[in-house]
Amino acid sequence: MMVQTRISELLAAMLPHVVFDGWSQASFEYAVADVNMDPGLAAILAPRGAIDLAVAYHRQGDALMLEVYRTTPTDSLKIREKITLAVRLRLEAIGDKEAVRRASSFFALPRNAAEGAKLIWGTADHIWTMLGDSSQDVNWYSKRVTLSAVYGATVLFWLGDDCPSHENTWAFLDRRIEDVMQVEIFKGRIRANKPLSAALVGPLWLLGKIKAPKPRHDMPGRSPES
């Protein structure tokens, strides 16, 4: 708990510098100085420097989304409405749009791209796990791939949405979720079409052999909280 507290302290000190210097080593060093932290301790808390705090910032948003969602009445909502709500709460959990804009550029760099993809995958996994997804086959992957794409596209749209209420972003999100639902309807029609299902028996059999990973903390999206 003490370690997490010190990381949060360092992250809070770094955010004002991120606006001007991005998620950089300079911002990290400024934050260390601002909280009068020993550089050796800072290196232990964040061995990779700025990228570790950028990761912590993203995960902080995930944690806040989960906290707010769990206190929101959702029993009467359809699955698509729950997904929409979760993505919206995730965006509303972000207190600093400029920090996210800088993070988007930071994680777009080739050396950071894999970490950025892992974070988005983790957000999608948190949402599906929170919604009670029990998939044990290829659907475990397809749901998270699809939601990762929806979330990533919505974040980029949100960054360019200057409307204070972000109405355009929520409309964009609704359209993306609708697109996903249409794909699911199409998949259902394929399964219901006996001649087509028979023609695809081979590929479907192979897909059926794909299983969801067993819980492991070192896999994308499989954090201890999952």
What are these regions (language model features)?
Residues 93-114, 118:
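Amphipathic alpha-helical segments used for helix-helix packing
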Residues 133-148, 152-195:
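Hydrophobic/aromatic-rich alpha-helical bundle segments in the mid-to-C-terminal region
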Residues 2-40, 48-55, 59:
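Short, amphipathic alpha-helix enriched in basic
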Residues 186-226:
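Long, charge-rich low-complexity segments
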Residues 79-93, 119, 123-130, 176:
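C-terminal ligand-sensing/allosteric alpha-helical core of TetR-family HTH transcriptional regulators
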Residues 111-133, 141-148, 152:
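Amphipathic alpha-helical packing segments from all-alpha helical-bundle domains
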Residues 68-102:
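Hydrophobic alpha-helical connector segments
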